[in-house]
Amino acid sequence: MVAGRAVLVSKYLSVARKTSRLRRFRHELTLVEQGVSRIAGVDEAGRGPLAGPVFAAAVIFPVEWILGGFPKSLREVNDSKQLTPETREVLFNELVSRPEVCYAITEVDCQMIDQINILRASHRAMNLALAQLRPAPEHVIVDGLRVKSMQFPQTPIVAGDAASFSIGAASILAKVSRDRLMVQLDQTYPGYGFAQHKGYGTPEHLAAIKALGACPIHRQSFSPFLPTQPQLFAESA
């Protein structure tokens, strides 16, 4: 790393401890200080629903943004679950319209989820997204726990979608993409209310399953009638 950039990074690392906006780039800044410039944030959406695919997205911001030039129009980027649907849509459109942002969005369908389980399917979606990034990342910051199958150096961050702009952006791209698909699938499979609950195990969705039975996009390995799986009924991912 050139001396000038090293001084600049050290300055921003110091400021980041006091400034909430820069604090959400502290993980990226630490890597930049180590000479890493292509840092991908990766996250998934749709781990908990009873229906539909799981999505993942990966995002690389230009290092200049990390070093203090982050656009004002993107400063609301956060954990997608903490944002309104309207705000997510605005930020999604802003992210994908920026030529400086390198991103990829992928999905793994419910049949594969049933074959390999939701954790492996989520990791597969993440790895597929990372593999599509051009240029490839030098380091990945991951929401949650370490992904054993990942081929890149990685830093897992608990609640990373709220702690990192890069992961937060990935969470928005993944969630909006999945939500849009579930709205479309509501037309293909009417009666289940996919446009409203996006496949999560709401009382309305469970009642529809009881009345209509499962449809082709339901995850057969997720039983909505097993009380031992309460985590499936909350929008936790």
Language-model features: where?
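RNase H-like, Mg2+-dependent phosphodiesterase core
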Residues: 1-237
